Amino acid sequence: MISFNQDIATALDRAIVKITDKFLEPPIMITISNSDSVIGTLGNFSASTGKAKSRKTFNVISLVAAALSGKQILQYKVKVPINRPLVLYCDTEQSRFHCHRLISRVYKLINYPTTEVHENLKFISLREYPTKERISIIEYALSKYAGKI
């Protein structure tokens, strides 16, 4: 987030990407098995968007399960750095009841006991909050768990 004291012109100059720039490819985190498709790299923020009832949640839950288990779940393989094992899941649409059901599905996919809280999953249900509060809560969570997610 750019602070109001920062020179915006300098920030703009630094933000421009040129064809002559050279960058190292970030470590690959999420792939689809049996293909060369990379769908996530270390340091990137991902959101799942699409039409209603298009199986977005099903795919995301599969990714979460793969990240927590270190195993392929459905077609997804996720490599999580040992020092950054935390999965932060922010749901803005579903009730706490339905979010709880999603956590149960993740636990079932990874054969994790539902009598224990998985230390590497922080599942946040935000539907009850206004948009500005959701943003603030997500920003706080990102800063609180920085270096672990």
Model-derived features: positions:
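Short, charged, low-hydrophobicity "junction" segments
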Residues: 32-42, 128
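A generic local structural motif
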Residues: 26-27, 32-36, 74-77, 136-140
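Walker A/P-loop NTP-binding active-site region of P-loop NTPases
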Residues: 38-112
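Conserved inter-motif catalytic segment of the P-loop NTP-binding fold
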Residues: 81-149
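Short charge-dense sequence patches
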Residues: 6-18, 47-56, 86-93, 121-134
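N-terminal pre-Walker A segment at the start of P-loop NTPase domains
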Residues: 2-35
